[in-house]
From Swiss-Prot:
This is Large ribosomal subunit protein uL10. GO terms for cellular component: large ribosomal subunit. Signal peptide: none annotated. It comes from the Bacteria. The keyword Secreted does not apply. Keywords: Ribonucleoprotein, Ribosomal protein, RNA-binding, rRNA-binding. It holds the Pfam family Ribosomal_L10. Part of the ribosomal stalk of the 50S ribosomal subunit. The N-terminus interacts with L11 and the large rRNA to form the base of the stalk. The C-terminus forms an elongated spine to which L12 dimers bind in a sequential fashion forming a multimeric L10(L12)X complex. It comes from Afipia carboxidovorans (strain ATCC 49405 / DSM 1227 / KCTC 32145 / OM5) (Oligotropha carboxidovorans). Belongs to the universal ribosomal protein uL10 family.
Length: 172
């Protein structure tokens, strides 16, 4: 790899690391090309990405970023999964590791917080940001719906009483 190509690779990685919410590092030795392609596809669908690069270049790119702490995990054949959603990359990585023994999660970082493999698994068990937003909106909308039902209930009762008198008057 020429010096200019290395500089370009480092700059691209640095941009990725600076804009990511979470980074997960895993060993991928022994995975087939098809398995790696499956991982890339799943990550892309979840809004995450997977990068395989030379460890030395990745360590240089990590310098000065929030996730610089993962540099110590870069030993051997490693893959780095990143996403803006703090749950997307860990969730896909943990699910993929369950079905592929060769894929071993080493750890990661969420901002400046270092994550060990157990913390990555715990993070993966959390609902995504979109799911949390939906729950919050549901909680906010529920009281408004109940208030609307309560304010409409007296009017409905009055209408039923009037209807009952009208029916009684017709019957007489």
């Amino acid at each position: 790899m020429e010096r200019a190509a290395k500089k370009e690779a480092v700059d691209a990685l640095k941009g990725t690391f600076q804009s990511t919410g979470v980074a997960i590092v895993a060993h991928y030795s022994g995975l087939t090309v098809a398995q790696m392609q499956t991982l890339r596809t799943q990550m892309k669908q979840a809004g995450a990405s997977v990068k395989v690069s030379k460890n030395r270049l990745a360590k240089i790119a990590l310098e000065g970023t929030d996730v610089a702490s993962i540099g110590s995990l870069l030993k051997g054949p490693t893959v780095i999964a990143t996403s803006n959603d703090p749950v997307a990359a860990p969730k896909i990585a943990v699910e993929f590791a369950k079905t592929n023994e060769q894929f071993v999660i080493l750890g990661g970082a969420m901002g400046t917080t270092v994550l060990n493999p157990d913390a990555v698994k715990a993070l993966a068990s959390l609902p995504s940001l979109d799911e949390l937003r939906a729950k919050i909106i549901g909680l906010l909308v529920a009281p408004a719906t109940k208030i609307a039902q309560l304010t409409n209930a007296p009017a409905a009762k009055v209408a039923r009483v009037v209807q009952a008198y009208a029916s009684k008057g017709e019957a007489a």
